[in-house]
Curated annotation (Swiss-Prot):
GO terms for cellular component: extracellular region; extracellular space. It holds the Pfam family TGFb_propeptide. Gene3D superfamilies: 2.60.120.970, Cystine-knot cytokines. InterPro entries: Cystine-knot_cytokine, TGF-b_C, TGF-b_propeptide, TGF-beta-rel, TGFb_CS. Disruption phenotype: Defects produce a giant phenotype. Residues 23-265 form a propeptide. This is Growth/differentiation factor 8. It comes from Danio rerio (Zebrafish). Belongs to the TGF-beta family. Acts specifically as a negative regulator of skeletal muscle growth. May down-regulate muscle-specific transcription factors such as myod and myog. GO terms for biological process: cardiac muscle myoblast proliferation; immune response; muscle organ development; negative regulation of cardiac muscle myoblast proliferation; negative regulation of growth; negative regulation of growth rate; negative regulation of skeletal muscle tissue development; negative regulation of striated muscle tissue development. The gene is mstnb.
Length: 374
């Protein structure tokens, strides 16, 4: 049994209590002291349920992302590695526009692990076998085994151009690197770009065909060389960082197709922290990743996870006939029904993995949509 499953089992066992088969009438007019005692007990139990949920969420995220531990990436490293490029900004803008509450068109996933939608791979220095006097310094891209050639929707190479001294035409060249003994390089793309004086820009190049070959024949991936010459022969492509150029190195953005999904239906009892409801109910819970010290999660910085808490008394079991039958069949020694999530939905997350690659994917079963007795 996985650690995550143990945590969930513990929280379920703690949430379970004996089914109340006593005299229902006797509880209709309790004393004030009894009410206060029950409310105090309910608050303590609810707080315990919340803490258990937070603890389980941390373990679930690492498990679903197939991480043994949280990547050791500090805020300074995040600032250095984050590309200041349009595709990343578009993803971040989605969180600003949609917020944490957006549920329109939400779906539930069958898979227990995260599904990848977009991968952003940063350029690194290529293998010495393709270099002469340690040149070129750029660019090699390593790819996650999650990427399958037949699932690639789009693959774009993003290159940042330094400002030209005057309006000019820039010749952007992409060459595939090969061992020096085999010729060193082979040009695969060449573009002409008109630029204005003093203006920086990001340029994107379609590299789906190249990436497909690399994935099918990994031994051919030695990296690429990028040049962007203006009319005076100046290379404007940023392929090594200088002062003030953090986040401007080339990177590849790979869009992956998603798997099948189902439309989610919402229903169930909702409560807030001030509610006096004793029945099984869904309560709000905001998870703040900064409180966890998880700087490796780029977005969202927080999300609404929700949690379940409350009683599953005999009088409520008519809503859950299967649980009622189980308890009637074995009235002694049973823990009774538990208040647990009966419907959950995924969250989208932008994060660094252990290889310092930026991943945009979907993590299933992270938001409690409905609670019930089972």
């Amino acid at each position: 049994m996985h650690f995550t499953q143990v945590l969930i089992s513990l929280s379920v066992l703690i949430a379970c209590g004996p089914v109340g088969y006593g005299d229902i009438t006797a509880h209709q007019q309790p004393s004030t002291a009894t009410e206060e005692s029950e409310q105090c007990s309910t608050c303590e139990f609810r707080q315990h349920s919340k803490l258990m949920r937070l603890h389980a969420i941390k373990s679930q995220i690492l498990s679903k992302l197939r991480l043994k531990q949280a990547p050791n990436i500090s805020r300074d490293v995040v600032k250095q590695l984050l590309p200041k490029a349009p595709p990343l900004q578009q993803l971040l803008d989605q969180y600003d526009v949609l917020g944490d509450d957006s549920k329109d068109g939400a779906v539930e996933e069958d898979d227990e692990h995260a599904t990848t939608e977009t991968i952003m791979t940063m350029a690194t220095e290529p293998d010495p076998i393709v270099q002469v006097d340690r040149k070129p310094k750029c660019c090699f891209f390593s790819f996650s085994p999650k990427i399958q050639a037949n699932r690639i929707v789009r693959a774009q190479l993003w290159v940042h151009l330094r400002p030209a001294e005057e309006a000019t035409t820039v010749f952007l060249q992409i060459s595939r690197l090969m061992p020096v003994k085999d010729g060193g390089r082979h040009r695969i793309r060449s573009l002409k770009i008109d630029v204005n004086a003093g203006v920086t820009s990001w340029q994107s190049i379609d590299v789906k065909q190249v990436l497909t070959v690399w994935l099918k024949q990994p031994e051919t991936n030695r990296g690429i060389e990028i040049n962007a010459y203006d009319a005076k022969g100046n290379d404007l492509a940023v392929t090594s960082t200088e002062t003030g150029e953090d986040g401007l190195l080339p990177f590849m953005e790979v869009k992956i197709s998603e798997g099948p999904k189902r439309i989610r239906r919402d229903s169930g009892l909702d409560c807030d922290e001030n509610s006096s409801e004793s029945r099984c109910c869904r309560y709000p819970l905001t998870v703040d990743f900064e409180d966890f010290g998880w700087d490796w999660i780029i977005a969202p910085k927080r999300y609404k996870a929700n949690y379940c808490s409350g009683e599953c008394d005999y009088m409520y079991l008519q809503k859950y006939p299967h649980t009622h039958l189980v308890n009637k069949a074995s009235p002694r020694g049973t823990a009774g029904p538990c208040c647990t999530p009966t419907k959950m939905s995924p969250i989208n997350m932008l994060y660094f993995n252990g290889k310092e690659q930026i991943i945009y994917g979907k993590i299933p079963s992270m938001v409690v949509d409905r609670c019930g007795c089972s």
